[in-house]
Amino acid sequence: AKKRFGDKISIDLESKVKDGKAFADQAIIAGCSGGTYDNLSEAAAIMKGKTIGNDYFTMSAYPQSTPVYLATTRNHIAEELLEAGVVIKPAFCGPCFGAGDVPANNGLSIRHTTRNFPNREGSKPGQGQISLVCLMDARSIAATAANGGVITAATDIQYEDTHKPYSVSYTHL
């Protein structure tokens, strides 16, 4: 970054490591690829009975569509995520192009989104602002959230997803 932008920006990755563990500041599960029913269901199963805590770490989830949002509500998935401290947002493409939940300056954001457009995820390097973005799978994001923001792979935890499979009815249309 210094080679490209000179002294305009400063990246502080060392502040994200405490006691040998890497910490994220923000987590997002969103968009047409991230906010699927299955991803949100698995995230809720991982988060069940746990919390993101009340410190600096935040997490938001954007269902991929209104029918998915409705199904997560009917099957208690949204309820379990909310109880864990996850903020449920409307079905919206914003996080992919930087219009929702952009990371703070020097914030480390873990995201399951479709895209990470250059300079859209909170970064404006020409103005001295840079964010740190790691694209991850929804399950590892939930594992990280359940672990207080410590970067955690979903393969490192045990959980069972007992939610109903996704189905949608168009009889009301």
Task: Give, region by region, the residue ranges found by the protein language model.
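Structural motif
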Residues: 25-27, 57-60, 86-88, 107-110, ...
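Structural signal for hydrophobic packing residues in well-ordered secondary-structure cores
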Residues: 44-51, 85-89, 114, 118, ...
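Conserved small/polar residues in nucleotide/adenosyl-binding loops
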Residues: 171-172
